[in-house]
Amino acid sequence: MEELQGYLEMDGFRQQYFLYPFLFQEYIYALAHGHALNGSILYEPVENLDHDNKSSSLIVKRLITRMHQQNRLIISVNDSNQNRFVGHNNHFDSQMISEGFAVVVEIPFSLRLVSSLEEKEIAKSHNLRSIHSIFPFFEDKLSHLNHVSDILIPHPIHLEILVQTLHSWIQDTPSLHLLRFSLYEYWNSNSLITPKNSISLFSKENQRFFLFLSNSHVYECEFIFIFLRKQPFHLRSKSFGSFLERTHFYAKIEYLVVVLCNDFQKTLWLFKDPFMHYVRYQGKSILASRGARLLIKKWKSHLVNFWQCHFDLWSQPARIHIKQLYNHPFYFLGYLSSVRLNSSVIRSQMLENSFRIDTAIKKFETVVPIIPLIGSLAKAKFCNVSGHPISKPFRADLSDSEILNRFGRICRNLSHYHSGSSKKQSLYRIKYILRLSCARTLSRKHKSTIRAFLKRLGSEFLEEFFTEEEQALSLIFPTTSSPSHRSHRERIWYLDIIRINDLVSHL
């Protein structure tokens, strides 16, 4: 990485990065696969590569050359049966090169982001990874807001849109051509089993490449927020300082201005709301405002028009739902969130006169949706669709302690993630399902009934399903009151949680 940084920081390459030469370096592909740099990962059988595998750099060069030559042999774009690259191993070639390309193309953006954070003395990104850091933000901000807009970010409908998006970021023409060849090779090899021109083609086989394409597309979708928030105040907001510079954006926004209004400056007053907040996780985002419903409707209209003009796609207005926080909860990150009004009456007396004061206190509420969680558990075969626990299929070589540890890990992950819920009844029901499912699984393994199995183990069976949270609460609240009673009404955000592990992957 130091060699890459030294190359990119040379005077001749500060303005324009030439990434193509890095694709011929073996350590790039070692980084892509997480292997040691002193070990080659490109040594494949001769029948797979059709050439000598002694020089990995030469292998990559030949693969790229072969991709260029085969792309000229496309017969017809419209004929799906003939629209194939000639050759029997092109899918492996493009997959391997795209993995290296994903590593190379991240380098300049990472350097820019790190330098931007250092200049503004912003904490490193690994300190901000927790998705649970969103909920304290909600708890602090949403109680003062009125409306929320639930947004689903549109997906790109054509691969060329992704190429054009990256064209404004990467000025290296050979790299862009190689990217286009790799994208269409994936499209051709998957067109019979997956929807055409979909970004989901890369989600399973090359997750790093998929994440880079997905993040670049999401950045384009979100850039209108940066543009509109900067314009009213004629300042470069520090809140958006970590975003990368763009080229030709004002040329792209020109058509949007014509569509929205002949005089764009007259509409900028709509975006001067200082209480506008935007939060996104993956493909779903939340836009909340303290202003009137008209303001949030204007934002919805501008977003739909921007996506249609910028990405040449029909963005359905139904993908953006406007809700009032007091009456309609919104689903985000596994929680049903809303703002509840708690009224309280205070009696006051001054001399001979007494009067009552009615006050309403806004409180941010988070509820665990029990139906989606039971659906996930049923899909993973911990229970049926009605929530009745069933025995989980297991491998014959697993011991009782391994099965118990895996069930306990799932329960702890769910308990920690949903510990911020205002009401814990749903969480206790999930624990009950996992506990009985584990008991049924072990009794099935020992060919015994669940009643006899539990009687033999005693009341201490599966204590770790419930003890860890109580121990954590006893450290946070070192009082004489029972932790179990406090856990029922206290809301704890475990900020070390980054994601929920897939339930199916544990057993």
Curated annotation (Swiss-Prot):
Cell compartment(s), UniProt: Plastid, Chloroplast
Signal peptide start-end: none
Coiled-coil intervals: none
UniProt record, GO biological process: mRNA processing; RNA splicing; tRNA processing
Main location as per UniProt: plastid
Annotated Pfam families: Intron_maturas2, MatK_N
A GO cellular-component term linked to this record: chloroplast
GO terms of molecular function: RNA binding
Keywords: Chloroplast, mRNA processing, Plastid, RNA-binding, tRNA processing
Family under the similarity heading: Belongs to the intron maturase 2 family. MatK subfamily.
Role description: Usually encoded in the trnK tRNA gene intron. Probably assists in splicing its own and other chloroplast group II introns.
Name of the protein in its database record: Maturase K
Organism whose genome encodes this protein: Umbellularia californica
Lineage start: Eukaryota, Viridiplantae, Streptophyta, Embryophyta, Tracheophyta
Gene from which this protein is expressed: matK
